[in-house]
A protein has these predicted regions:
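A short SAM/SAH-binding and catalytic strip from SAM-dependent methyltransferases
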Residues: 134-148
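A short acidic, Gly/Pro-enriched loop at the edge of an enzyme's catalytic core
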Residues: 125-135
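A short glycine-rich, Lys/Arg-flanked "PGG" loop and its adjoining helix->strand segment in the class I
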Residues: 151-163
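Surface-exposed loop/turn positions
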Residues: 70, 131, 164-165
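Class I (Rossmann-like) S-adenosyl-L-methionine-dependent methyltransferase catalytic domain
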Residues: 2-72, 78-91, 96-124, 168-252
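Short, flexible/disordered intra-domain loops and linkers
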Residues: 148-150, 179
Length: 252
């Protein structure tokens, strides 16, 4: 399923692959889960279990989705931090990443019922139409500087999901003004001391230089409209106007 008029820039896709390959070779764990537990493999994978318990399990329960025997796909799998937990629930796990080096390292762990595949950074080529039950992505789109690449992943999710399949994406959901390679961002803090209530979150405005670490923000209404235009029903949105916005839904 292509999005007419929405084509990621080749220069960005090449830069993303190059930079994340370098990061994977330098210290994959540090760049995936920056940086405190990067030197301890056990703690690194334990953090994946914690994030799964926080961001995946409750969503599956809210949507009354039973993952057993189902196919789950993760966009931006890295070296398998969350995959190591996800394979316990799903009948089959597919992890995709823009970095072939990340994929090589993830494959080396030989997780059961798991396959890993390098992708271009803007599509899910090689994944069958209507062959996936759940698509998940965490701490990935925030690093993508090309908004069209993010939206292509939305479209590819609509393509690969079975009818009634579900998805959950994390992204930066800030107000933005694009100025070429720069981006003005405005939103609400989501720091640990300000997450208990929206009223206690303080506003901020900042200027960001877009690269393969500081990616685009997607405004909440824009994310919802794009999903709906692709036949993806948005069931819930959390963390609007923060760097921890979640969009979850179901294929119609």
């Amino acid at each position: 399923m292509a999005i007419e008029g929405h084509k990621p820039e080749r220069k960005w896709l090449d830069a993303i692959r190059r930079d994340w390959d370098v990061r994977a070779r330098e210290n994959a764990r540090a760049f995936i889960n920056w940086p405190d537990i990067a030197d301890e493999e056990g703690a690194f994978f334990a953090s994946g279990r914690e994030d799964y318990a926080m961001y995946v399990t409750p969503f599956l329960k809210r949507t009354q989705f039973d993952p057993h025997g189902k196919v789950g796909l993760e966009i931006g799998c890295g070296i398998g931090r969350i995959a190591s937990r996800m394979v316990e629930d799903f009948g089959q796990y597919i992890g995709v990443d823009v970095s072939p080096e990340m994929i090589r390292k993830a494959s080396s762990y030989e997780l059961p019922r798991a396959t890993f595949q390098a992708v271009s950074g803007g599509d899910l080529n090689g994944i069958s139409d209507s062959g996936v039950d759940f698509v998940f992505s965490f701490a990935v789109f925030q690093h993508v500087p090309d908004k069209e690449a993010i939206f292509n992943y939305f479209a590819e999710t609509a393509r690969v999901l079975r009818p009634s399949g579900i998805f959950r994406f994390h992204m930066k959901g800030l107000w933005t003004l694009a100025l070429g390679r720069m981006q003005i961002e405005a939103g609400l803090s989501n720091s640990a001391s300000h997450v208990t209530a929206r009223a206690t979150r303080f506003p901020f405005v900042r200027l960001r230089y877009l690269d393969t670490w500081q990616g685009r923000s997607i405004r909440p209404a824009e994310a919802k409209a794009k999903c709906e235009s692709l036949g993806l029903e948005v069931l819930e949105m959390e963390g609007e106007w923060t760097t921890m916005m979640w969009v979850g839904g179901r294929k119609k």
